[in-house]
Amino acid sequence: MKNTVTTFQKAKNNGEKLTMLTAYDYSTAKLIDESGINGILVGDSLGMVCLGYEDTLSVTMEDMIHHTRAVSRGVKNTLVVGDMPFMSYQSSVYDAVVNAGRLIKEGGATAVKLEGGATVIEQIKAIVNAQIPVMAHIGLTPQSINVFGGFKVQGKDEEKAQKLIEDAKKIEEAGAFAIVLECVPAKLAELITKAVSIPTIGIGAGAGCDGQILVYQDMLGMFSDMSPKFVKKFADVGELMKDGFKAYIKEVQEGTFPSKEHCFKIDESVLDKLY
């Protein structure tokens, strides 16, 4: 079944949990799509897990379009959400609409995601008015890492918790179809989920959200030096890959690979004529 923004809303209405993962390339997107997931986020997290940056701030629109286009080619039934990178929407409403349009038209995404609450309401409204579905993102917003002073849980005191609830309501009123809640106390995330009629997608926000999202490299255990508290390792792919790499190196060095079964043949009479 093809997943759309309507699918997301129906899931919330019916009490069905939504599932999302990140993807950044064709082959990964194809595998995730075949697994039956609801949505893929082509996140600006690619800056850290694919490009090796320390944060997401250096990711460009060209980066996002390039990776979103690859992911879009790999899916058949999954909703593809393209992340709007730092300074692609904060500077003006005009820039927000133009860049959102590029992720749809050039990247092949179905929807876009942008970070922020009350400060980006006008951008959300304008993008929605341009007939582009918007997924919002509040709580820990990685593009604001310099303001937060690091990757920290958000909404732990009354004032900040209340602001998150109010932001969620304003986001819904602006026309967004879903909200990502990142690194928010579980009980607060549950309150926000009940306060809005659109789906909430949690990452480090407890099981009370309408759905969950993780960075696929994290949940597959691909990086031993990156292990956020909220991540469960569903497979140990990193170690499996290293074992495979080591086995390949060993067999090449020993001369056991490639063996006859991996080689192509030529008639000996042809060889005789070459000398």
UniProtKB/Swiss-Prot annotation:
According to the record, the signal peptide region is: none
Which cofactors are reported in the record for this sequence? Mg(2+)
Q: InterPro entries, alphabetically? A: Pantoate_hydroxy_MeTrfase, Pyrv/PenolPyrv_kinase-like_dom, Pyrv_kinase-like_dom_sf
**E.C. numbers:** 2.1.2.11
Q: Where is the active site?
A: 182
* Pfam families in the record: Pantoate_transf
Catalysed reaction per UniProt?
Answer: 3-methyl-2-oxobutanoate + (6R)-5,10-methylene-5,6,7,8-tetrahydrofolate + H2O = 2-dehydropantoate + (6S)-5,6,7,8-tetrahydrofolate
Q: Which domain of life is it from?
A: Bacteria
Q: Could you state one GO biological process linked to this protein? A: pantothenate biosynthetic process
Binding of Mg(2+) occurs at 44, 83, 115
Please share the entry's free-text remark on the cofactor.
Binds 1 Mg(2+) ion per subunit.
The UniProt record gives the binding positions of 3-methyl-2-oxobutanoate as: 44-45, 83, 113
- What's a single GO MF annotation on this record? 3-methyl-2-oxobutanoate hydroxymethyltransferase activity
Q: What is this protein called?
A: 3-methyl-2-oxobutanoate hydroxymethyltransferase
Q: Which organism was this protein described from?
A: Clostridium novyi (strain NT)
